[in-house]
Amino acid sequence: MKKEKEQLINCWLKSGIVKNKRIIAAFRSVKREYFVLSEFRKEAYSDTALPILAGQTISQPTTVVGMLEALELKPGMNILEIGAGSGYNAALMGRIVGKKGKVFATEIIPGLVSFARQNLDKAGIENVKVINTDGSIGYVSGSPYDRIIVTAASPEIPEELVQQLKEGGIIVIPVGSEIGQTLIKAKKTKGKLVRQQLGEYVFVPLKGRYGY
């Protein structure tokens, strides 16, 4: 698996998809095979999304690192993730923000909450908290956040998330219909979001009050 992992890294570096060296270090450090179902472990480093539980998926590695690059993560940051899934993305962010940082990862599906927590424990990630809640309304208890990442498709950017984002903070979120979305990177400037489009994607739909 190490060979396949390094092939992905070389591809990202050559294409310029990833420039933040901390993302590469985190990808090397965190074992994706811990976050997939046992029957898919041999495919852990194929550049594809894989099924997990409850009809959900773990995103393809290139999509994951592209979103992390857009977040402009730094050590010590306070992060909110909407849609913990298997916990893999949260694990990478936990490594990047380091011991002085914190990741709050919300997940609305109870079975996935248990799955993510088990996987994070297995990987030795201690600065990620997985919460069973409706992430479409955010998580006030951990706010305000330096960065917010939404890993499911949303009809729009929920105002609650904007309110929980620090001034100067960044949110990355796929926005659109259930069958196709535009990945948005938005920076909070003077209380409002300044948006940038990062391309077209297809994510699983967001569940909850502001989901589908």
Question: What residue spans do the PLM features occupy?
Answer:
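Class I SAM-dependent transferase core
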Residues: 1-84, 88-96, 112-129, 189-212
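Conserved nucleotide-cofactor-binding alpha/beta core module
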Residues: 72-194
